[in-house]
Amino acid sequence: MALYDEDLLKNPFYLALQKCRPDLCSKVAQIHGIVLVPCKGSLSSSIQSTCQFESYILIPVEEHFQTLNGKDVFIQGNRIKLGAGFACLLSVPILFEETFYNEKEESFSILCIAHPLEKRESSEEPLAPSDPFSLKTIEDVREFLGRHSERFDRNIASFHRTFRECERKSLRHHIDSANALYTKCLQQLLRDSHLKMLAKQEAQMNLMKQAVEIYVHHEIYNLIFKYVGTMEASEDAAFNKITRSLQDLQQKDIGVKPEFSFNIPRAKRELAQLNKCTSPQQKLVCLRKVVQLITQSPSQRVNLETMCADDLLSVLLYLLVKTEIPNWMANLSYIKNFRFSSLAKDELGYCLTSFEAAIEYIRQGSLSAKPPESEGFGDRLFLKQRMSLLSQMTSSPTDCLFKHIASGNQKEVERLLSQEDHDKDTVQKMCHPLCFCDDCEKLVSGRLNDPSVVTPFSRDDRGHTPLHVAAVCGQASLIDLLVSKGAMVNATDYHGATPLHLACQKGYQSVTLLLLHYKASAEVQDNNGNTPLHLACTYGHEDCVKALVYYDVESCRLDIGNEKGDTPLHIAARWGYQGVIETLLQNGASTEIQNRLKETPLKCALNSKILSVMEAYHLSFERRQKSSEAPVQSPQRSVDSISQESSTSSFSSMSASSRQEETKKDYREVEKLLRAVADGDLEMVRYLLEWTEEDLEDAEDTVSAADPEFCHPLCQCPKCAPAQKRLAKVPASGLGVNVTSQDGSSPLHVAALHGRADLIPLLLKHGANAGARNADQAVPLHLACQQGHFQVVKCLLDSNAKPNKKDLSGNTPLIYACSGGHHELVALLLQHGASINASNNKGNTALHEAVIEKHVFVVELLLLHGASVQVLNKRQRTAVDCAEQNSKIMELLQVVPSCVASLDDVAETDRKEYVTVKIRKKWNSKLYDLPDEPFTRQFYFVHSAGQFKGKTSREIMARDRSVPNLTEGSLHEPGRQSVTLRQNNLPAQSGSHAAEKGNSDWPERPGLTQTGPGHRRMLRRHTVEDAVVSQGPEAAGPLSTPQEVSASRS
């Protein structure tokens, strides 16, 4: 029955029935009857003139059927049994069944039978038409190849052996290998003399190619397609996430015309067979059949000849979304790259191109692009929102309430739900609150029967409550309001879905966290047995999965199955969501549970990449179990000794084990927080630290927790109250902004390491300690400088982070910045008073590290700020010794030693000028030989700008008050630049002395002191506008402590 198929709309018998007896077609539709249609191959040319059409129309009666002319017919299994009224009691096979609809949407069934009911021949098999130049099944291929397939098997066995050795080769390697196997088998086939003669005919040659390709690919399909699936794993997961979010899509949403929707169910069934095809040729034939089904006319009255490419694309888009094929990208790659028997410039190639266009259209986000939040929910593709919230413009109070909830109109929602004032008015008009007189009864009943009353328990035609609508539309601000009005967080709709189900299905993490906070149950199963976690995994919403799992790991049931027996891990593995899988496995999801098909999550893995992730966690779990097993007691030990030992140490062992479990639990909670910080998940951080909106708004008014200043310890004045409130607040989870992991990393450390510039201010304003050290004695500023995160460094320095602290290796933040070549950070640190000649445990200064790492602009910047080239490291090498000969860095370093003394030498001498006019001129002569780097030019412009007045040593120490501010425009116009210093009351001779020096002054070290009134030392400090410095966040490394910057090359 399933082996034969034909287009009944082109069947001569059915066409004749429609043309000659349209009345019968209308009648059978009205009574929802059955039409018997003989297959095309069994019909003779005289069938229209001799056939009695009434005998082919069946009307159901008790326990059997009757034709319109009163004959009895029985349907037994896959056969038609003819009864009373027929001249010959035949048994006619049923080939297949289809359901048709007329223009009034009345349905009737058509049974395609092997031959007409009047047929007398002994043979009952249909003469099914077939394409003589097409092979559809592997059985057809084996029959065509005959004994040649045995020769192919030896080549294929060899391919299997070599593939295992070259499994990690490139895709092109495997394409070539498979093509070589195909070519070799085809060559063997053409060695047959008979087939060689047939190959001269193009049609026969194409048939041979198809046969070889189908056979070869069928035998190596598991190897090749598994590899392709691994290569396309990330693309498949991304595409699946888009299509899963579009399950509410309707045909009208993408412009599918009604006349094209009749064949969509058949096309969908055919497309679902794609993954059962084991060769590119078979997959293409499947796609072609889908296109053919789409373009078939549902009746003679509907002409589909004018179907354009856009109409076909709309239907294909709908099929791609609604057909559950989780590896579209792998299928496309497989078909395009491993089809060897034909070029793409044929009918099959056109079908493939059409599907590619539809898939690319979905990948671009054209169907899933969401408008900004300000545009409301009307343009979003939600769970039928457009149907009743915006498209149904009714005056129903419930519809009005739901519309305001969907659009986030909190004021109107609160007005509609505020019944307290009305109730108070009603009570005041009553004789007394418990009165049941006639007047009071009328008053109360009138209120109860008021159709305009809406409550948090009102429902629409889907069983949705206001909380359902707020959840499905992502209106987190309305969740608090609805719950405060009495909304039930665990209310279910007609499909058994709670608001938490819908929030997880749509991926709204903030709504999910709020519902969990209000005690929404994460274990409620809908009509399909799915929990909210199942839906979050189905649609790939990793944030919602984390919210559900992290809320309460102890009570979250990760291993509960739905009606198919699938756990959340089954679903995530089937759709290839690696992040979701890792979250589930990290929190104890089992990889050994079987669903109703006896499949474990490992067996459901979409590709080998997902499988390897789960296997790795499975092996690590087994190792942890083995390591946690206690050793067996020695049999030689006496019972008395064991009893005595247990009696004396039972309490201590129990308390120790409980403390150990408590510590492990605490560290698990801390790790969750640190992972959320590393991911930049602000909503999860807020939830774990229990920050409210009020906390964020009041963050500007908070003071540092490291050194709070109160009027007295218990003061609650307006100045001290915010800090007292923050310090007194301890989250129920025990987590705070200064908690640390086992390696000493705090949330601020992790945020600094990963460049989370948006989290740094919030953590600091909530009391994070910028001076906290991890196991390597590194502060957050060390990590930010090591990774080159400018905005993070700037925020930490603005929060008074100390720029000269050293870690375990003796490195300062400046040394890390110089080693990494981050010249913007170097300038920023120097501006905030970083010690320029501080050395690490190897004796290397910042200049050493910059020279070793060959960062010419950093070297130049350090020299301009007075870095000493005379400092020796522990190998007795200066920065000059570390530089390469005849390099640009050596050229920079050679200018300074001839005229710049070290800091100690300057202090011992008669405070001579730090840089002479001669060296300034010598240096400026080489200025334009350097690369044209904007930041470097900036410092040249600064040092050649204006005349400066001298300062006393006290004024030098307050150098942050005398910083010139250069605008970005002035940096690009050196002729117009102006540097403004705050003028101090200095003696006239000092001012004239400084004026005579002009541009010949060189920047001074900040540590110099004044020893005589006759000599003044001037320090120039320069501030760079933030807009000049690159502020883009860099990709952070893994969550780990910083490693010591290598300086071994010195």
UniProtKB/Swiss-Prot annotation:
Q: Where are the ANK repeats?
A: 396-426, 462-491, 495-524, 528-560, 564-593, 597-627, 668-698, 743-772, 776-805, 809-838, 842-871
UniProt xrefs under PROSITE patterns: ANK_REP_REGION, ANK_REPEAT, VPS9
Which residues does the annotated region (Required for interaction with VAMP7) include?
658-707
Region of interest (Interaction with RAB38), residue spans: 451-600
Residues found modified as Phosphoserine: S962, S970
| Keyword Zinc attributed | no
Primary location: other
Q: Which GO terms describe its cellular component?
A: cytoplasmic vesicle membrane; cytosol; early endosome; intracellular membrane-bounded organelle; late endosome; lysosome; melanosome; membrane
**Result of changing H712A:** Disrupts interaction with VPS29
**Effect caused by changing Y550A:** Impairs interaction with RAB32
Keywords from the UniProt entry: ANK repeat, Cell membrane, Cytoplasmic vesicle, Endosome, GTPase activation, Guanine-nucleotide releasing factor, Lysosome, Membrane, Phosphoprotein, Protein transport, Repeat, Transport
Q: Where is this region: Sufficient for interaction with VPS29?
A: 396-460, 692-746
**Outcome following mutation: D679A:** Disrupts interaction with VAMP7
Q: Where Phosphothreonine occurs, residue numbers? A: T1023
InterPro entries (alphabetical): Ankyrin_rpt, Ankyrin_rpt-contain_sf, UPF0507/Ank_repeat_27, VPS9, VPS9_dom_sf
* Skewed-composition ranges (Basic and acidic residues): 994-1004
User: Superkingdom of this entry's organism?
Assistant: Eukaryota
- Where is the segment annotated Sufficient for GEF activity towards RAB21? 1-372
What are the start and end residues of every segment in region (Disordered)?
Answer: 625-665, 987-1050
VPS9 domain mapped to chain residues: 233-371
Q: Provide the protein's localization.
A: Early endosome; Late endosome; Cytoplasmic vesicle membrane; Lysosome
Impact reported for Y687S: Disrupts interaction with VAMP7
Which spans does this entry mark as compositional bias, Polar residues? 628-637, 1040-1050
> What is a GO molecular function of this protein?
GTPase activator activity
- Function summary: May be a guanine exchange factor (GEF) for Rab21, Rab32 and Rab38 and regulate endosome dynamics. May regulate the participation of VAMP7 in membrane fusion events; in vitro inhibits VAMP7-mediated SNARE complex formation by trapping VAMP7 in a closed, fusogenically inactive conformation. Involved in peripheral melanosomal distribution of TYRP1 in melanocytes; the function, which probably is implicating vesicle-trafficking, includes cooperation with Rab32, Rab38 and VAMP7.
Query: Under what name is this protein listed?
Result: Ankyrin repeat domain-containing protein 27
**Organism annotation:** Homo sapiens
Q: What taxonomic lineage is listed for the species of origin?
A: Eukaryota, Metazoa, Chordata, Craniata, Vertebrata
